[in-house]
């Protein structure tokens, strides 16, 4: 039943994507790059091949890249990925033994560094899992090297499990750390937490504030994806089980969320003095619209930093996917921070009267004032009804829609999209600026995508790691993109213009980094693009200025190494894989496999039911006779009875037809033919042809001739 429902959803995708995206899905890259083993690489130090470093990109500071790893923090050169400094921090042996006794593996019972913050010049905060007993340290750079100056409990700051999805943000100047993680050994108590880090152990701590424990209305088994500060708020992006939604099978649904808190939130009056008074969350809507039944991408996987979009607005690029199923899809959606702020500031709240009632919009006239969730100069003085309301109604009623339809949709025959980073406002020939997206996949590739007038073009697909190694972090600089897997880090250039050797192919890339220099006849990378010798067309990917003129464009299959000619439509654009083609092929394949599986199961059950009571040595595998000596009907045998065989030398008489039919194959010349020639699985005894015919004409068979009976 679940598979049939999945197929029905696929047809909904077809209808939605045909109407919204013009039938384009699985956009083919303009060029393919195999970068496995190429470029600067870092693979850890002192880690065996069967151990994982669980690399996590923590920060970029000038020319330094700070990476958390297994029992270590690496300070890498951003330009070469060589090691500038390394801090070793391994748990004591007794902590590892205690962790193992609690049921964890020796691999997990190490110290995986998950949080790092630069507090001030020369002082860094480092936190790790520390054998499922999180700890934090402050390291200070002195003239004698890097020294550990302080260690304290990291509960609520670092996760326990290195595989747990968590995020953290240090706000300079406030000495506060905003964290989204779990605070117990088994990972059930999820929280969004603000921790004030003391400069000295004796200094007075400000209020540490967190979300309520074990309250599904606030957080329900979340997977945290990203955290960043924007104006007076801190935003948390995650996915969780939606308390307000249950599907037709009464199974939990995963929804994508964005939540926010005020930076200056001091908590409420007692007993809510350690609870947020500004915590709100809303659902994110990344979907293919189709009337009353959109196709949703519900699972948030990655979020970019806010990108300046002009007009006092920023946008955020995100990666979504559908839940695990036979047909899994991914999408890239863009959200406006201005729209998000408007919904948080003015949106309707959602509420449920009791556990059995439906979730509904809360009556605006009954919302207390000041508005719950708004920032207050001193939240401890807020009215009790305002604080109580926000503790019980943190969810907004309306989902926050993406900016238009998804920019990019990857179908079931593609790898999942896992990470995203953006190189903003790249200048093209002519002075226009474009955002370039670098998107990681679950099979070790990085897609380079440009957005032109709201449409996505996949410029390049680069294979960075061996197939099956997911991309877990991405970082861009002006000239390079840093790609992180669990056990390897690579740095590659942001462009590969020199791969194209003709004007038409260079222009076809639609890459703002690349243009054809007619003065030297090369595809070059530039920044200022001064001069009129540069040929580029970001909108159509074709130019009459090229010596070749406008040619039939070539697109690349990302599974092949060579270009394949692609037909050009009347508009001049190449035809991509149609959504109807990709999705229907997947749907038909799934349906056929379902039917074949059911058919085989029925046949096996029938065979087992009939053969079990009569099992004997004679009923061996491969025999064409059952345990009673009766011939089995094979799939190669004809069911045509003797009365329907039209040949001249067999007399038709009632006596020659009874419940037992002789099955014989007659060729075009009306000569009896050995059944073995039809691949029946047995070899008919060699007989004289004339003797057989004579016997048949006399309505008899030779005594040693075997007859195959068919019971109808």
Swiss-Prot record:
Positions annotated with a glycan in the UniProt record: 75, 165, 285, 346, 455, 559
Membrane-side (Extracellular) residue stretches: 17-581
Gene encoding the protein: smp-1
Signal peptide residues on this chain, from the entry's feature table: 1-16
Function: May function in growth cone guidance.
Domain Sema as annotated: residue spans: 28-494
One GO cellular component term noted in the UniProt record for this chain: plasma membrane
Protein name, UniProt field: Semaphorin-1A
Record has GTP-binding as a keyword: no
Disulfide bonds: 99-109, 127-136, 262-375, 286-333, 497-514, 506-523
Keywords assigned by UniProt, alphabetized: Developmental protein, Differentiation, Disulfide bond, Glycoprotein, Membrane, Neurogenesis, Signal, Transmembrane, Transmembrane helix
One term of GO molecular function: chemorepellent activity
Cytoplasmic topological intervals: 603-712
Membrane topology term: Single-pass type I membrane protein
Chain ranges passing through the membrane: 582-602
Name of a matching Pfam family: Sema
């Amino acid at each position: 039943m679940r598979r049939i429902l999945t197929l029905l959803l696929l047809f909904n995708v077809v209808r939605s994507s045909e109407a919204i995206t013009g039938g384009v899905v699985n956009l083919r890259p303009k060029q393919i790059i195999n970068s496995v083993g190429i470029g600067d690489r870092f693979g850890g130090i002192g880690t065996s091949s069967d151990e994982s470093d669980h690399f996590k990109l923590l920060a970029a500071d000038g020319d330094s890249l700070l990476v958390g790893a297994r029992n270590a923090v690496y300070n890498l050169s951003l330009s070469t990925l060589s090691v500038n400094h390394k801090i070793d921090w391994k748990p004591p042996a007794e902590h590892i033994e205690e962790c193992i006794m609690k049921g964890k593996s020796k691999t997990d019972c190490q110290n995986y560094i998950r949080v790092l913050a630069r507090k001030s010049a020369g002082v860094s905060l480092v936190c790790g899992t520390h054998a499922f007993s999180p700890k934090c340290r402050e390291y200070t750079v002195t003239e004698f090297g890097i020294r550990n100056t302080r260690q304290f409990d990291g509960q609520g700051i670092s996760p326990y499990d290195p595989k747990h999805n968590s995020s953290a943000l240090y706000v300079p100047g406030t000495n506060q750390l905003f964290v989204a993680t779990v605070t117990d050994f088994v990972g059930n108590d999820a929280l969004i937490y603000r921790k004030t880090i003391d400069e000295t152990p004796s200094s007075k701590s400000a209020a540490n504030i967190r979300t309520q424990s074990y309250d599904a209305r606030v957080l329900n088994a979340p997977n945290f994806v990203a955290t960043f500060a924007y104006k007076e708020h801190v935003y948390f992006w995650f996915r969780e089980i939606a308390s307000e939604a249950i599907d037709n099978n009464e199974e939990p649904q995963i929804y994508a969320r964005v939540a926010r808190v005020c930076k200056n939130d001091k908590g409420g009056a007692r007993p809510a003095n350690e609870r947020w008074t500004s915590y709100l969350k809303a659902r994110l809507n990344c979907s293919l619209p189709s009337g009353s039944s959109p196709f949703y991408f519900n699972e948030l996987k990655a979020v970019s930093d806010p990108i300046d979009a002009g007009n006092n607005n920023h946008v955020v690029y995100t990666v979504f996917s559908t839940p695990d199923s036979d047909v899994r899809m991914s999408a890239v959606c863009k959200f406006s921070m201005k729209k998000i702020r408007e919904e948080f500031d003015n949106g309707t709240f959602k509420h449920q009267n009791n556990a059995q009632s439906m979730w509904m919009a809360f009556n605006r006239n009954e919302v207390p004032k000041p508005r719950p969730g708004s920032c207050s100069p001193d939240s401890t003085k807020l009215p009790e009804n305002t604080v109580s309301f926000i503790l019980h109604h943190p969810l907004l009623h309306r989902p926050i829609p993406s900016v238009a339809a998804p920019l990019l949709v990857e179908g079931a025959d593609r790898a999942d999209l896992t990470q995203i980073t953006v190189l903003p406002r790249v200048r093209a020939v002519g002075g226009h600026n474009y955002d370039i997206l670098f998107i990681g996949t679950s099979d070790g590739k990085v897609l380079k995508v440009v957005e032109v007038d709201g449409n996505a073009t996949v410029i390049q697909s680069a294979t960075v790691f061996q197939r099956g190694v997911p991309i877990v972090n991405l970082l861009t600089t002006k000239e390079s993109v840093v790609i992180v897997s669990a056990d390897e880090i690579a740095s590659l250039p942001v462009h590969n213009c020199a791969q194209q050797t003709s004007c038409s192919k260079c222009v076809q890339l639609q890459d703002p980094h690349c243009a054809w220099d007619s003065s030297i006849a090369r595809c070059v990378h530039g920044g200022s693009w001064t001069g009129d010798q540069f040929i580029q067309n970001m909108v159509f990917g074709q130019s009459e200025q090229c010596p070749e003129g406008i040619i039939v464009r070539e697109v690349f299959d990302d599974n092949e190494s060579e270009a394949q000619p692609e037909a050009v439509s009347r508009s001049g654009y190449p035809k991509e894989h149609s959504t109807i083609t990709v999705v229907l092929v997947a749907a038909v394949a799934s349906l056929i496999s379902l039917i074949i599986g059911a058919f085989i199961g029925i046949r096996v059950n029938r065979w087992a039911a009939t053969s079990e009571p009569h099992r004997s040595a004679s009923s061996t595998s491969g025999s064409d006779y059952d345990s009673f000596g009766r011939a089995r009907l094979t799939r190669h045998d004809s069911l045509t009875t003797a009365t329907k065989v039209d040949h001249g030398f067999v007399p038709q008489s009632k006596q020659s037809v009874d419940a037992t039919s002789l099955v014989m194959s007659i060729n075009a010349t009306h000569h009896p033919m050995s059944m073995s020639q039809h691949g029946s699985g047995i070899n008919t005894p060699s007989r004289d042809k004339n003797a057989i015919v004579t016997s048949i004409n006399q309505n008899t068979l030779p005594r040693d001739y075997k007859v195959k009976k068919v019971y109808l």
